[in-house]
Amino acid sequence: MAANKSYKSYFLDPLWNNNQPLIAILGICSALAVTTTVNTALTMGLAVSFVTGCSSFFVSLLRKVTPDSVRMITQLIIISLFVIVIDQFLKAFFFDISKTLSVFVGLIITNCIVMGRAESLARNVPPIPAFLDGFASGLGYGWVLVTVSIIREFFGFGTILGLQLIPKCFYASEAHPDGYENFGLMVLAPSAFFLLGIMIWGVNILRSKKERR
């Protein structure tokens, strides 16, 4: 498998052609919870990229000495190690974001993308392609999260990355009762579900049109 694909293909395929949330429909549950703001979505995307890339690398590195009978538990131990590392890193250097993400950083271990890449690819290819695929799978997951979070934060709070983009003077007040009001639905998890559904639908349309050509 490794001989037939370039490093470039291993990195680029998960970003679009084999995007895990949009094509494989994986990692959807956490996407509903962490896309309220761009900060949390970006942090989660980078955290998953780190965990998936590093765990895939070590799963591949140990693939020839890992018996099939303990394959899954070995993968879980490796993934857990890197989840703990990123969780402690966020608590030490980005405490506010870590507090906002709460248990969802620890729940990266249950993210189907991480185990999926380790099981379906990392144990079958050398370490470098495994790392590139894992890291890019996380980035592919991350850009989907960020896209959803930009829409949710802008319409839900009027901000992007905490910066106020909709001027305060546009908002409803006693002097201007008919002014703008934030779209409260965007703050709720169902909005992420519908936005992801629209993105998946759009990607499927683009792929079907491309296949017809």
UniProtKB/Swiss-Prot annotation:
It is found in: Cell inner membrane. InterPro entries: NqrD, NqrDE/RnfAE. GO terms for biological process: sodium ion transport. Keywords: Cell inner membrane, Cell membrane, Ion transport, Membrane, NAD, Sodium, Sodium transport, Translocase, Transmembrane, Transmembrane helix, Transport, Ubiquinone. It catalyses: a ubiquinone + n Na(+)(in) + NADH + H(+) = a ubiquinol + n Na(+)(out) + NAD(+). Its EC number is 7.2.1.1. The keyword Transferase does not apply. It is a multi-pass membrane protein. GO terms for cellular component: plasma membrane. Its main location: membrane. It comes from the Bacteria. The chain crosses the membrane at residues 21-41, 42-62, 77-97, 101-121, 131-151, 153-173, 183-203. Disulfide bonds: none annotated. NQR complex catalyzes the reduction of ubiquinone-1 to ubiquinol by two successive reactions, coupled with the transport of Na(+) ions from the cytoplasm to the periplasm. NqrA to NqrE are probably involved in the second step, the conversion of ubisemiquinone to ubiquinol. Composed of six subunits; NqrA, NqrB, NqrC, NqrD, NqrE and NqrF. This is Na(+)-translocating NADH-quinone reductase subunit D. It comes from Chlamydia abortus (strain DSM 27085 / S26/3) (Chlamydophila abortus). The lineage of its organism: Bacteria, Pseudomonadati, Chlamydiota, Chlamydiia, Chlamydiales. The gene is nqrD.
